[in-house]
């Protein structure tokens, strides 16, 4: 029975092409143009996502402000003229606009859109998963934009080499002081590197290697690649590979000789849309995409991952100092490149019996454990078994 269940699991995993990080489940505080602070919640993932106030009012972001949303006859959202406020600061006109929101209509639209988006990504396009044994090598490209640079500047390479493959006993790397919030507060630092996490999970059987290059400045703005619901990640991966091509021999990253680079990972300057509350930021994700991102040194780039430099969003970083990203998001998306699926619903689960593991599993909300993913939840026994890193006793 166990072997049958595992076979079904791998079959299901094989039909999914694109994965994305779950939205951060906590409160994100943003600052409106009138000087007020607004508490925002993020829902969904890269395929379909939306924003509400802390008490569930639907929002639309336009420019630098978050507005109370109007529900159209199709279930879509558009901004009203009312800047949103927390419940204790609303005037009567805002309350009237809120009462007109049709949550049921929007929920139906959200379910349809999320299902359609995921169906469009169906199919693994013959792209193999990244190996989950031994010491396979992945290429990591650091990129910044015309309007957004790494807080650590040219030292970003040193910072992210430590992030990916440093030892927990190592001193903080040169450049880490740029992340003032993490530098000054030990509770806002990673408790180990990505390599540490997978070494611990596999009991030493799996030690992925990460070659870090860059940072490279791309010609476009961050908004060009984020674009809210018009996510332009394909262009981000392609442009990053083109920028790195002069320095990288991509053929070194095709270990099995199938003509495809085993994995290219992009770490970009700025914030993740899954945590920032800004839908124009880029959403961390991974997958084989919908085709090749180009051919470099005779090898096609197909399997990719995307990760942000910083944790949370602009407002929190301005208040508490810049916060380096937690390894949790990276470990979650990297686990997708190994073949593990998401274990969370992306639409309103109020009509179903939600038995998801939430913060107890890396592939659900456990990517954000400990102040935003600085000490992510370990793999579950099922995930360890699927990866071949443990042999549970059958009862």
Regions found by a protein language model. Give the residues of each.
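Extracellular hydrolytic enzyme modules, especially secreted metalloproteases
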Residues: 263-265, 269-395
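A broad, structural surface signal
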Residues: 6, 238-242, 328-336
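Bacterial N-terminal signal peptides
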Residues: 7-15
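Zymogen propeptides/activation segments of proteases
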Residues: 4, 19-303
């Amino acid at each position: 029975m166990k072997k049958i269940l595992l076979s079904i699991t791998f079959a299901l995993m094989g039909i999914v092409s694109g994965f994305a990080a779950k939205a951060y489940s906590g409160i994100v505080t943003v600052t409106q143009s009138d000087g007020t602070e607004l508490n925002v919640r993020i829902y969904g993932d890269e395929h379909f996502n939306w924003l509400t106030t802390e008490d569930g009012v639907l929002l639309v972001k336009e420019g630098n402000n978050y507005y109370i949303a109007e529900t159209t006859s199709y279930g879509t959202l558009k901004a009203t003229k009312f800047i949103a406020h927390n419940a204790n600061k609303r005037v009567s006109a805002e309350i009237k606009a809120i009462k007109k929101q049709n949550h049921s209509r929007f929920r139906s639209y959200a379910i349809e859109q999320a299902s359609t988006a995921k169906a469009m990504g169906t199919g693994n396009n013959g792209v193999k998963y990244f190996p989950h044994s031994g010491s396979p090598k992945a290429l990591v490209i650091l990129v910044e934009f015309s309007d957004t640079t790494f807080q650590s500047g040219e030292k970003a390479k040193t910072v992210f080499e430590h992030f990916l493959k440093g030892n927990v006993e190592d001193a903080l790397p040169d450049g880490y002081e740029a992340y003032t919030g993490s530098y000054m507060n030990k509770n806002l630092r990673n408790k180990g590197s990505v390599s540490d996490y997978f070494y611990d999970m596999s009991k030493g059987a799996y030690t992925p290697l990460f070659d870090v290059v860059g940072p490279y400045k791309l010609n476009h703005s961050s908004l060009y690649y984020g674009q809210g619901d018009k996510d332009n990640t394909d262009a981000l991966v392609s442009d990053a590979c083109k920028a790195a091509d002069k320095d990288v021999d991509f053929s070194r990253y095709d270990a099995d000789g199938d003509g495809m680079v085993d994995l290219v990972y992009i770490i970009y300057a700025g914030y993740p849309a899954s945590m920032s509350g800004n839908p124009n930021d880029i959403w961390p994700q991974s997958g084989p995409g919908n085709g090749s991102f180009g051919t470099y040194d005779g090898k096609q780039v197909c399997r990719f991952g995307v990760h942000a430099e910083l944790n949370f969003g602009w407002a929190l970083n301005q208040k508490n100092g810049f916060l380096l990203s937690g390894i949790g998001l990276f470990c979650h998306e990297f686990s997708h490149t190994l073949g593990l699926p998401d274990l969370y619903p992306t639409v309103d689960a109020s009509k179903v019996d939600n038995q998801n593991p939430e913060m107890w599993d890396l592939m659900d909300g456990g990517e954000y454990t400990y102040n935003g993913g600085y000490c992510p939840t370990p793999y579950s026994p099922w995930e360890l078994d699927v990866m071949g890193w443990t042999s549970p006793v059958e009862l």
